[in-house]
Amino acid sequence: MNKKLRVGIIGTGNIGTDLLIKIQRSQYLECSIFTGRNLASPGMRIAASMGIRLSDEGIDTIVNEPNLCDIVFDATSAKSHLSHAPILDRLGKFVIDMTPAKIGTLCVPAVNLDEAVKSRNVNMITCGGQASIPIAYAITKVHPEIEYIETVSTISSRSAGPATRINIDEYIETTEKGLRIFSGAKEAKAMLNLNPAKPAIDMQTTVMAEIESPNLKQITIEVEKIAQQIQRYVPGYRIVVLPTYDNHRLLVTVRVQGLGDYLPKFAGNLDIINCAAIEVAEHFAKKNLMRNK
């Protein structure tokens, strides 16, 4: 059996619990501590049934026992991560930030995975960022002159937990920052709609760019290419509207369905960021395990 890198998860809500279940399938990762604030939470009960070590002392558990883990997923909130980040940095941990705190290197695995894992703190941006930024990146590979990009993500209200709702402002800021960085556009706008429809809808994200005379054929090639790369770690990622041009605007729409691990399949918004985070952790683990052979 291959040696695995030990993972600590701070935050035992939807994101943290789904990460825990995904880690159980990994050839390169094992969860050594699942820590939050409430031992009676649903996530804690699931972790206990798996025999995972639990704690209700949050980050203090890792501070008191630094050798517990090599990688830390912070699945708390942007505000909490602002205080967690310097502590974990002093402990020398490789940190994957699931919040929109935007302290570390912004990462979309299909775009900058190798570069991101050179950092000690990797920020997974937002669910809308993971869905839209690769499309924006593909479009501006063909048309780097684009100056304005906009993205609108619509998710089921049932998939928006307390952390998502608390972090809405940070979500907008971080998604817009990621769009500007990866596309090169001077201006970016991000919007998030919560849809209460029943049955619940899958996540859907539309990317719009202002452009004159687009090369639709080449844009379509680049968009389909990057979608295939994303599907390697997010199987439910699909282009539902190929590049379309109307009234000086280029549009592409994607839909994301989750794997249905801890979260329902319609919660593709949570699944895409978790799948991306696992991809980062496994890439880091493979590099370190090879180095230590």
Question: Can you say where each PLM-predicted feature lies in the sequence?
Answer:
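Active-site-lining helix/loop region of Rossmann-like oxidoreductase modules
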Residues: 6, 10, 14, 130-250, ...
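C-terminal helix-rich "cap/oligomerization" subdomain common to oxidoreductases
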Residues: 283-293
